[in-house]
Swiss-Prot record:
The protein's name: Sorbitol dehydrogenase
Subunit structure and binding partners: Homotetramer.
Residues the record lists as Phosphoserine modifications: S208, S222
UniProt cross-references to InterPro entries, sorted A to Z: ADH-like_C, ADH-like_N, ADH_Zn_CS, GroES-like_sf, NAD(P)-bd_dom_sf, PKS_ER, SDH-like
Alphabetized GO MF terms: D-xylulose reductase activity; L-iditol 2-dehydrogenase (NAD+) activity; NAD binding; zinc ion binding
Similarity section: Belongs to the zinc-containing alcohol dehydrogenase family.
Binding site for substrate: Y49, E153, R296, Y297
Gene name as annotated: SORD
Length: 354
């Protein structure tokens, strides 16, 4: 292996304690590949772990951050056949450690022992060199950039949520929240056939971005009641949406989602807030509004790559800021302040292109 000085990594040590450190370059196992990292997006979860925890997931020992990533294969394990050095790949951060009951039914995201980048105690890939399960690295076509490859991870959240919601041709869809996850749900819904999408948020600037990437209607929330929000959504669409995708985790927004959804429709909870939430459950039950949860995603990378390669979805406008790995701390400050939408960290000093 090369000298350790060459694997600069962004490591969280505890609440508020983020450091750039040199780690050794790892050696790939038989079913792994060593990757030279290229582009890694900062996710809200990375910022939360910088503050120490997300719910039951607590940072107890130093952990490398980053899980929205792409890079180039530099070395392959002895049993790897489908990849070779030089291949550009997108990384699916969740790789099951065993073929358990959830893997057998194709819902490996629910496996309790899954490895997941930058979820304690597993290290992520905000570094120069990183090894990963080769079966969860997907080759990128020449017309898909590294940054698009990194954005497959957030896009997958949208694909999985829309799939759980049953979004189909001609649907009217409400997306609550215009942050990165709200916008990938907007993109996925449109790509999957939604005819009209309304996006709600408190922030006018985020809503203008939603409009830019394809929202049919935007609704700026100030202090309306959940029922009033539902009425406004219905007014914009002409009827209630068959599908609501809730990306904020805010109690009043979940309440509005229940009131807004068409009878017999589906509400999917993507953004998560406090564990106990007060909602008009009877209102949902008596109108047969199905409430579904999502946990990350599964089986989305191949279709996301096809969507990007065929230009049926455009994620490029989501990236608003870029920083080299050496300036990762500054990048995290930018992300934390909510100044940009998606902040991208460039890990390859010899190639800082998108």
């Amino acid at each position: 292996a090369k000298p350790a000085a060459e694997n600069l990594s962004l490591v969280v040590h505890g609440p508020g304690d983020l450091r750039l450190e040199n780690y050794p370059i790892p050696e790939p196992g038989p079913n792994e590949v060593l990757l030279k990292m290229h582009s890694v997006g900062i996710c809200g979860s990375d910022v939360h772990y910088w503050q120490g925890r997300i719910g039951d997931f607590v940072v107890k020992k130093p952990m490398v951050l980053g899980h929205e990533a792409s890079g180039t294969v530099v070395k392959v394990g002895s049993l790897v056949r489908h990849l070779q050095p030089g291949d550009r790949v997108a990384i699916q951060p969740g790789a099951p450690r065993q073929t358990d009951e959830f893997c057998k039914i194709g819902r490996y995201n629910l496996s309790p022992t899954i490895f997941f980048c930058a979820t304690p105690p597993d290290d992520g890939n905000l570094c120069r060199f990183y090894k990963h399960n080769a079966n969860f690295c997907y080759k990128l076509p020449d017309n898909v950039t590294f940054e698009e490859g990194a954005l497959i991870e957030p896009l997958s959240v949208g694909i999985h949520a829309c799939r759980r919601a049953g979004v189909t041709l001609g649907n009217k869809v409400l997306v609550c929240g215009a942050g990165p996850i709200g916008l990938v749900n907007l993109l996925a819904a449109k790509a999957m056939g939604a005819a009209q999408v309304v996006v709600t948020d408190l922030s006018a600037s985020r809503l203008s971005k939603a409009k830019e990437v394809g929202a049919d209607f935007i609704l700026e929330i100030s202090n309306e009641s959940p029922e009033e929000i539902a009425k406004k959504v219905e007014g914009l669409l002409g009827s209630k949406p068959e599908v609501t995708i809730e990306c904020t985790g805010v109690e009043t927004s979940i309440q509005a989602g229940i009131y807004a959804t068409h009878s017999g429709g589906t509400l999917v909870l993507v953004g998560l807030g406090s564990e106990m939430t007060s909602v008009p459950l009877v209102h949902a039950a008596t109108r047969e509004v199905d409430i579904k949860g999502v946990f990350r995603y599964c089986n989305t990378w191949p279709m996301a790559i096809s969507m990007l390669a065929s230009k049926s979805v455009n994620v490029k406008p989501l990236v608003t800021h870029r920083f080299p790995l050496e300036k990762a701390l500054e990048a995290f400050e930018t992300s934390k302040k909510g100044l940009g939408l998606k902040v991208m960290i460039k890990c390859d000093p010899s190639d800082q292109n998108p």
